[in-house]
Regions:
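Periplasmic binding protein-like
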Residues: 42-44, 48-55, 64, 207-266, ...
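Ligand-site clamp/hinge motif
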Residues: 20-61, 211, 663-689, 694-696
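Local pocket/hinge segments that shape ligand/substrate recognition
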Residues: 21-22, 32, 54-157, 175-177, ...
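Long beta-strand-rich cores associated with HINT superfamily self-processing modules
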Residues: 256, 331-372, 380-384, 639-642, ...
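Extracytoplasmic/peripheral linker and loop segments enriched in polar/acidic and small residues
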Residues: 101, 113-116, 213-223, 252-332, ...
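Surface-exposed, Gly/Pro/Thr- and Asp/Glu-enriched linker/hinge segments
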Residues: 19-26, 58-59, 65, 93, ...
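Append "and occasionally in soluble cytosolic enzymes with long acidic Gly/Pro-rich linkers
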Residues: 95-203, 207, 308, 360-365, ...
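Aromatic- and charge-enriched surface segment that lines or borders ligand/interaction sites
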Residues: 39-47, 90-102, 106, 424-489
């Protein structure tokens, strides 16, 4: 995460076109519709403009079914199984890594995609799928596992592991020390796909001889049972997870491997709560932390780290990925301006901002209206709340919806770097927060940094009418240091989830130097081969006024609430949610107390002395809470008008303020995107080993072709990148390479990509190789043409078809590397 923290991903650039409001519509209503079929009819009838959840493919598979609708296909989400590896007084078979690994052969990924998901997905075995920019660089590592549904092999692996641990199978029932081994599966009942996945996995485990108890629930219950409990209590053994994609498309993902596989990110069983049993893996931590903080010297070294982390994460199998989703979203045909971000999909932050309707209002159906909590530190962590909250704030920088490149929104920048191996001199009067002395300290002479970023910040009014200023930025930075530093004895500025993550940011931060009211220099020990990523890492911003931050902080320090889910469970207090009236009242009480005592937070005492300014801040936020019954105050194009739990509805309204920098339509260009398309491929259905193979490819709106050729044993024999000459390129497979092909089905994957749109069109096929040219048929070349399609995601169906074809490849079980070779 960036230096900005304190407020979720801070981010965005800098233009100065002044307007009264940044959106076309005046009001957006988010209304809960649990049933997708009901929501579909409401969109057709015009009672809903958009539904922010996938629609079953069989409901919109005909022209008649789509009448009155626009259908958008989005990628980015996925399904996984989280397995509890805890050691406990009660025997837990999943504490044995071989048992966890065997689950990969117990789940039928093809069945999940083809039957449960109606073909709208792709099997996946790691956290990266075909739609992720980093996928192509680690594809051969992923392919090396060759998982397939093989319950016989799974049973063999599990039996060997359990018998070695002392378990016995009596009358087809696994026992340990005379007691039946019972597994508890927490199964999401609010998602039909995950409910079915849970039922199928439970059935497979029962068939192997385990007693399985099914515990059904939604995300709120999962926050308590799975994410909020001590894993060693064994309240759950496996959980059917679902991921809604990111809030933005990311070209160079620094977080994914750490989030999905590594303990330090506080997203693995135990969640870094010191009072709980915690999954540990120092090797994964070290690799993924290097990726996160940019501790590599080249793009090649970064890719090597990705390969190692992927290999270890899959081998450990604490989180097992099943399928990447292709979600179909429906939009009423009278609604315009939808922006289908490659990461967030239709629920991108840009869609409500850019949408246009005949009524100047927008009504969006959502699957859940409230899950988890709303606070900018460790709340807003679920898809449902993030989709709404992201429209309420502007970040400093953000990610381009189709390239994943970092671009400015509320801060422009200039980068100077000496990385990866050099350093810059930091001015002596640059400052950093010292948690021990509770003061800002000058860095002093001789201080060095790898990079320097100068930011020009584009401030506007907060929703409560107060002008953003440099104090909001400095308080955000203080908070990052205070709560991200190593905890001291009886340290109350520590959060079990937030602190370990933020500590990685803090160690790269050297100092800042405010230049004027809206310009600041940031010095970091961070390097990336893309300078925009350095700016992203160093960016300073806040989505929340400093006085709200100070009140939240004091409420947590006083033990009234917790920033995080796990902290709330372990301390027996509420998970702070600023949208809830009771929690907002706590914030108001602290603001009133601050005003009465003329309190100025220590982090601002060197910069603020004007009592009138401080009191105006307190007064404005107190007034806001009194009038709105919540404490969500931010700086984006919409403000939170009201949350009605009874009506299951949240309403946001356009922030009409002359200081807001972007006019309606500012992001309109994101509506139009040209996808790379494969138009034609000529390749033999049968080839002769030892001969040169030429494969002409024709594509449009594309710049490069990536290809991967594997033989019938699953060994990669050729891979490469070809530049397109106009629309054409020839893939040449040499004599030596074709000699390595097998007699069975050989697999070819072709990815056509564009520099401007990082969504590949993909073609996958299998062909035979023979040693005798007389065995070749008279007609050996198969050509196909793909006609132009109105469907932007023309390549997605090639992926689905390709995934089915791939299943014909002869399977070779991957030999696992020993633990000794993988550990350090």
């Amino acid at each position: 995460m960036k230096l900005l923290l304190v407020t979720l991903l801070a981010v965005l650039g800098t233009e100065t076109a002044f307007a009264n409001q940044g959106s076309f519509v005046d009001e957006v209503s988010f209304i809960q519709y649990l049933d997708e079929n009901t929501a579909l009819e409401e969109v057709k009838n015009g009672n809903l403009d958009i539904y922010y959840f996938r629609i079953p493919s069989d409901r919109i598979d005909t022209f008649e079914a789509r009448e009155g609708l626009q259908v958008y296909e989005s990628t980015g989400g996925s399904y996984s199984i989280l397995i509890n590896p805890a050691e406990s007084e009660k025997f837990n078979p999943f504490s044995i890594s071989e048992v966890r690994y065997a689950v990969n052969y117990l789940v039928d990924r093809k069945l999940i995609v083809n039957e449960l998901m109606g073909g709208f997905g792709v099997p996946m075995i790691s956290n990266y799928g075909p739609y992720d920019p980093d996928y192509l660089f680690i594809l051969d590592e992923i392919e090396s596992f060759h998982f397939r549904y093989n319950p016989t092999l799974a049973e063999e692996m599990i039996t060997n592991a359990l018998e070695s641990a002392g378990a016995k199978k009596i009358d087809n029932t696994w026992t340990f020390q005379g007691e039946e081994i019972e597994l508890i599966g927490f199964i999401r009942s609010d998602d039909p796909v995950r409910k079915s996945i849970g039922a199928i996995l439970s059935s497979e485990l029962e068939r192997l001889g385990f007693k399985v108890k099914k515990d059904y629930g939604d995300l709120n219950k999962a926050f308590v049972v799975v994410y909020g409990s001590d894993p060693s209590d064994l309240k759950w053994n496996f959980y059917t997870e679902g991921w809604g994609g990111r809030s933005a498309f990311v070209k160079y993902d620094p977080v994914g491997l750490g989030q999905m596989y590594s303990p330090w990110f506080s997203n693995m069983p135990g969640f870094n709560d010191p009072s709980y049993w915690n999954y540990q893996n120092d090797y994964l931590d070290s690799i993924t932390q290097r990726i996160y903080i940019g501790n590599f010297s080249s793009a090649e070294e970064r890719i090597d780290l990705f390969r190692k982390a992927t290999n270890e994460g899959v081998n450990e199998s604490v989180r097992i990925f099943l399928a990447s989703k292709i979600d179909q979203y429906v939009v009423n045909d009278k609604t315009q301006g939808v922006i289908n971000d490659f990461g967030a999909g239709v629920p991108s932050r840009f869609t409500p901002i850019n949408a246009r309707t005949e009524t100047n209002s927008l009504t969006i159906g959502v699957k859940q209206i409230y899950q988890g909590s709303w606070n900018p530190i460790m709340g807003i962590s679920d898809t449902y709340s993030r989709q709404i909250y992201d429209t309420l704030y502007d970040p400093a920088v953000f990610k381009h919806p189709y390239t994943g490149d970092t671009f400015p929104i509320r801060s422009s920048w200039m980068v100077e770097t000496a990385g990866p191996n050099g350093n810059l001199t930091v001015p002596e009067d640059a400052i950093t927060w010292d948690p021990l002395s509770q003061t800002w300290q000058k860095v002093g002479p001789g201080t060095k940094s790898t990079s320097k970023v100068t930011f020009d910040l584009n401030f506007s009014n907060w929703h409560n009418g107060q002008l953003m200023d440099i104090n909001d930025i400095l308080y955000s930075l203080y908070f990052t240091f205070e709560w991200g530093s190593e905890p001291l004895d009886d340290d109350k500025t520590f959060d079990t989830e937030y602190t370990p993550r933020t500590a990685q940011t803090v160690q790269t931060f050297i100092g800042v130097k405010p230049i004027d009211n809206d310009t600041i220099e940031v010095y970091v020990d961070y390097w990336h081969f893309d300078e925009a990523e350095i700016a992203d890492w160093a960016s300073l911003w806040s989505s929340t006024p400093w006085e709200i931050m100070a009140a939240m902080e004091q409420a947590v320090v006083d033990g009234k609430v917790s920033f995080s889910r796990s902290g709330s469970v372990s301390k027996g207090v509420n998970w702070l949610s600023l949208i809830v009236p009771n929690d907002a009242a706590i914030i108001r009480e602290y603001l009133e107390e601050f005003k009465t005592s003329n309190f100025i937070p220590p982090a601002l005492q060197n910069f603020v002395s004007n009592t009138q300014y401080v009191n105006s801040r307190y007064d404005s936020s107190i007034k806001w809470i009194n009038e709105n019954d919540h404490a969500i105050i931010s700086n984006g194009p919409f403000f939170l008008d009201r949350y009605s739990p009874e009506a299951r509805m949240i309403v946001i309204k356009a922030f009409k303020d002359n200081t807001y920098p972007f006019p309606a339509g500012h992001w309109k260009d994101f509506e139009n995107v040209k996808f790379p398309k494969i138009l034609k491929i000529d390749l033999p259905t049968v080839i002769k080993k030892g001969s040169v193979l030429s494969i002409p490819v024709t594509a449009e709106d594309a710049s490069k072709i990536h290809y991967f050729l594997t033989n019938s044993e699953g060994v990669t024999v050729a891979t490469g990148i070809k530049e397109l000459d106009g629309k054409n390129a020839d893939i040449i497979i040499s004599e030596a390479q074709t000699s390595q092909l097998g007699n069975g089905a050989n697999d070819l994957k072709i990815f056509v990509i564009s520099e401007n749109v990082l969504r590949p069109d993909i073609y996958t096929t299998s062909f035979l190789a023979v040693t005798d040219s007389t065995a070749l048929p008279e007609t050996t070349t198969v050509g196909f043409d793909i006609q132009d399609s109105k469907n932007d995601y023309v390549g997605i169906f090639a992926i689905i078809i390709g995934a089915i074809i791939v299943g014909t490849i002869v399977y070779l079980r991957r030999k696992r590397k020993s633990t000794q070779n993988l550990r350090h």
